[in-house]
Each structure stands twice: as structure tokens, then as C-alpha cells.
Amino acid sequence: MRTHYCSAVNELSLDKQITVCGWVHNRRDHGGVIFLDIRDRSGLLQVVYEPENKEIFAIAEKLRSEFVVRVTGIVRKRPEGMINDKMETGRVEVIGTQLEILNQSPTPPFLPDDHQVINEDLRYKYRYIDLRRAVMQKKLTLRHKLNSCIRNYLNEQNFLDIETPMLTKATPEGARDYLVPSRVHPGQFYALPQSPQLFKQLLMMSGFDKYYQIVRCFRDEDLRADRQPEFTQLDIEMAFINEEDILQLIEGLLKIVFKEILNITLPDKLPRMPYKEAMTRYGSDKPDLRNPLELIDIADLVKNCDFNVFASAANDNSGRVVALKLPNGCDLSRKDLDNYGQFVTIYGAKGLAYIKVNDLSAGMAGLQSPILKFLSETAVQSILNRVEVQTGDVIFFGADKAHVVNESMGALRNKLGHDRNLINSGWQLLWVVDWPMFELDPQSNKLQPMHHPFTSPQELSAEALRSKPTQTLAKAYDIVINGYEIGGGSIRIHQPELQKTVFDLIGIDEQEAHEKFGFLLDALQYGAPPHGGIALGIDRLAMLLTDSTSIRDVIAFPKTQTASCPLTSAPSPAGNAQLTELGIRLAPTITTK
């Protein structure tokens, strides 16, 4: 039907007859001549129809935006003064000799033009029009290239692409499952997988020592700004390996991805940072190292001060007091400071103390803060020295339980970095390693795994794990790019007794363990090899590589923030006949006034 994509028509095609198919992007009438910009996924091509061919010219006059056409013509150089170097095909044009309207279009709700600002709901309702925009075509094409890079690299490393079930058993993995009722087993349900975690471990026990899959996963999570109920991850598992093998594999993969897609050369070895250091310096387990701001502990300097907010946190074993210096921050207004104070309350902080350093040489007289009256001059000077302030700086303080300080001041660090344009350009990748095996749930005070219950501790002793669970480190690792967690993984437990110990510590008794994970515990008894793996978020990685602001921009048909699809109106009610066949009766909806 066509001989060329639009962008393939160039000066090598001069004087040749070509045929292209696509959409009418633009139509212009100039001096009795009709100019068309024809668009396909590769780009734009200018076609000229002259009035001498009355029959074809009459068809061209009928064309409107988004008509679908088939165009045949002769390629020629554009006249001097008509060259457009902003277009890939801007040095040539096609003199149309044939024209066929393949389909018509009414005036669309918006034109697929990158220069328009389009309401997001409208974009998703008419996603098939939105995806015609050049920027969207480029993003999804880059995503395809990303997947191709991944497959080529792993295939060369002797990995096998093996599919795992989509209809599986509900297992606790940190979020709610999407349940699928079984018609042939009334009252029973499948679960859509939150990840292929257990199946890929079973593949290692089956002798497939190198597995990968680019796979859809499903999580019925609470609504958050940039989460999708269904998402895509690169899932990897290997047997007879250690942590170093996984890290080197992923470093090699990312090196190829960045080179082939962005022409950026990454170092052979990425920096590594222990989890404890990341939380101490940045208040985050996914620090953006492009941001120069850091948290500085000052608890030892304020233990005996008269400011109870500082003193109580400093003398609490689970408390923390930190300072965060903002260079040249004295220009912040009272309203700005109040807004930042309100911001940290979102993360559980009760407020935000600060000191403005208007004139460092003037001593206490050169400082401005509501808390100065509670602090001795010695304590203040010690803080200023440790934080290494200069005239014009402002210091923010966080004092509370350590988890509140980390979350609130880590978020403030990120916000200040963006608000004050402190984020350096470029790419900062790092591994966060040496994670705690468990954390205490602040509500229930029960142990819960930091990653998942199949992660191996660094010390492979059930007795040691029971004696000091909160001090035990895991063989776990996350890859972070520019402040985004792109992936995480671990070495897995391959000894049945150690796995039972972990289940017991997190409150899964023997009966529940066998009901939910009996198949895994059985498999572990039959010669399970040491194994481990990782999963990378394809959506988020594609978002970063395309410089997008949302993962929805790199997903062809995303859900909205309310987990709905304006295009198809999903989710939607099921018919009574279908519900009856499935043995489901809906409970009445209870509304509260």
C-alpha cells in the first residue's frame, strides 16, 4: 500500500515516485496550490497538489485535519527559501500525482499537536488521538527500544525468557491483590500476581538458572499520584550466584541502555551506599544525589538545652534531631517559612524550627529565630560550627521520632532542592545496600520485612536471626536513579528451616505458612540452590529516559489517579447473569451522610 514511511523520503529519493500513507496533519492553500503535511509515526512529509490535475486537486480540496490518505507523487527539492531544517524531510517535497481518501474524520476534540496544552482527562478519553502526537510516538518508540536493549543483553548472557502464571494464589506481598472469581470452583478466587516472585524462585529450583521476563504485575494499592494498578517490570532471577553477581549484571545492563538510548557512558561500577548512611545523610532510602543538601545530626549538642522539643528527642533512644542548611536562604519570607512548616506536617512533623543567619560576624545579634531564647550561645555556636554556615544561610531543624524526622526532613530536602533550583543536571545512579532485615510496625509494634519474607539475612543462622532480628541486615539491594527507586532485589532464602523462622518472626504461624506457602516450603526441601534476583520498573525507567513527569506518559493506555480508564469506562458493573454464573451476590452499598 505504501513504499516509504514519511521520514524515509529524503534527497536520496529525488525524482523517484513514492507512496506514503498517513493522516492529514495540516492543509494550506497558497496561490491556488494546496500544501499538505502528511503524518505517520515516523514524522511529517510535505505534499504539493497543483491545479493542473483537476480531478486530484478536487479531492485535495476536500481534505481536513485527521483524514486518512494514501498519497503518490514524485520527490523534488524544495525551492530556495522554502527549506525547513526543523523537519527531518524539510529539504524535499512530493508533487502529488495520486490521492486516495482512505477514511474521513470529524473535527477531533483536540488536534495531535505538541504545542497545545490539553486537559489530561480529555487526553485519556481520546487516547488514540493523543497517541498520534509526535512526542507520544517518540516516548513509546523509546520504550520499545528499551525493551529491545534489555532482551538483547539478557539473551546474550544466556538468560531464558519464561512466562509465569497470571492466574495464581493470593500471597501477602505488601499490597492488596486483585481477585478473579472462579466459575468452575464457586466461592474460590484466583489472584492476579503482584510479582512473579515465588514462581521465579521455583524456576531456580527447577534447574533454569537464568530467568527473565518483562511482565505485567497488579497491585490494588491506595490511590497515589504516580502509581498504576497494573505496571510492567523486568523480572530477573539467577541460581548459584551472590549479591555481587546481580549488581554487576544490572550495571552492565544499564550501561548498555544508557549508551544505546541516550548516548551516555556510565561508569563500569556504580557507587554503593549502606541503607543506614542514606537515611542518616538524606532522610531517604532513595536519595537524589544531584541535590547537595544533607541532614546533619545535632542531638549531642542539644541534649541539655532548654528547648524541650530538641531535648526530649535528643534524649530519646528512638528520637533524632537534625539540621538542614539552605545556602543563601535568608531571602525566604515569613510566608515561605510558614509554608515549609505546613509542608512537613504532611509527613507527621509537628512543626519546623529555623535560624536565619543574617550576619555571622555579629554573633547572636546577627541571627533571627523564635527558638534562640531557648538555646544558650554556646549551643548555638556549636550548631553553627557543625553545620558550617555562612552569612545569608538559613538552618531548618527536625526533632522527633527518627522515622518522622527522616521522612519529613528528607521530603523537605527534596522540596528545597527543587524550589531553589539546586538540583544539578545529569545522572546520579547508586546502589542502596545493607538493608535491615525487618522493621517494627509503629502501630502494631510487630516485625515486618523491609523487602519481602523470602529475602535472605546476611547471617545464615536461624538462632542468630531470632536473637537479634532488628539488628540483622539483609542481602538486599535497591538501584536508585536521580532519586527514584528503579528496582530492588535480594538473595533469597534457600533453606526451609530459615524460611520457617522468618515466617514465624513476622507472625505467620506454621499452619498459615503451609496454607499460603506450602508449595514453596515443599520445594525448598528438594535441593533448592542458592539464588537471588531483582526486578526493575520498566514504566519508571522509561519515564526517566524520556524526561517525562509521569509514568502515564510512557504507558499506551494508562489508568488515571482514581484507577479508572476514561477511554473504556473501566471498571464497570458486571451483568446480573454473569454474577449469577460466578456465584456472586453484591452487598448493598452503604452511604454515610
Swiss-Prot record:
SUPFAM superfamilies cross-referenced by the UniProt entry: Class II aaRS and biotin synthetases, GAD domain-like, Nucleic acid-binding proteins
Compartment annotation: Cytoplasm
Binding-site positions, ATP: 219-221, 228, 485, 537-540
Reaction catalysis annotation: tRNA(Asx) + L-aspartate + ATP = L-aspartyl-tRNA(Asx) + AMP + diphosphate
GO biological process per UniProt: aspartyl-tRNA aminoacylation
Binding sites annotated in the UniProt record for L-aspartate: 173, 219, 451, 492
Region Aspartate, annotated ranges: 197-200
Site (Important for tRNA non-discrimination): 30, 81
InterPro entries, per database record: Aa-tRNA-synt_II, aa-tRNA-synth_II, aa-tRNA-synth_II/BPL/LPL, Asp-tRNA-ligase_1, Asp-tRNA-ligase_1_N, Asp/Asn-tRNA-synth_IIb, AspRS_core, GAD-like_sf
E.C. designation(s): 6.1.1.23
Pfam family, one: GAD
Keywords for this protein: Aminoacyl-tRNA synthetase, ATP-binding, Cytoplasm, Ligase, Nucleotide-binding, Protein biosynthesis
One GO MF term: aspartate-tRNA ligase activity
Record-linked PROSITE patterns: AA_TRNA_LIGASE_II
Catalytic class of the enzyme: ligase
GO cellular component, one term: cytoplasm
Known function: Aspartyl-tRNA synthetase with relaxed tRNA specificity since it is able to aspartylate not only its cognate tRNA(Asp) but also tRNA(Asn). Reaction proceeds in two steps: L-aspartate is first activated by ATP to form Asp-AMP and then transferred to the acceptor end of tRNA(Asp/Asn).
Family recorded in the similarity comment: Belongs to the class-II aminoacyl-tRNA synthetase family. Type 1 subfamily.
Quaternary data: Homodimer.
Listed name of the protein: Aspartate--tRNA(Asp/Asn) ligase
Protein's gene: aspS
